[in-house]
Amino acid sequence: MTIYEYTNKGCREENQDYICHGSIPDDGYICVLTDGMGGYSSGNEAAKTVAESIREYIQDNYSKIDMPNIINEAITYSNDELMLKRLSIGSKRMGCVIALLVIAKEYAYINWLGD
């Protein structure tokens, strides 16, 4: 599968977008896009932490039977990882919005959180 990525920082000083993707069993694929919340500190770190933890969780816990539940668990797991990151760097507030696509067998699962 060929993936093309494009991001634009717009009028902000820093681009807080993060994109990661990878394969899952049975010729499946996952793509996660996150965007750090500009009003919060370390938005770029939040975006990377959340995207990578979602991708890793789904790859490590892949299940053909219950993908919607795996996706929800991955988002919860990514929030836990973000809170650990926030504490480790001493930030008071970190966050990001999430969009993700999982292609598994003949199904495409789309999920988002935030605007």
Per-region residue spans from a language model:
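PP2C/PPM-type serine/threonine phosphatase catalytic domain
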Residues: 1-114
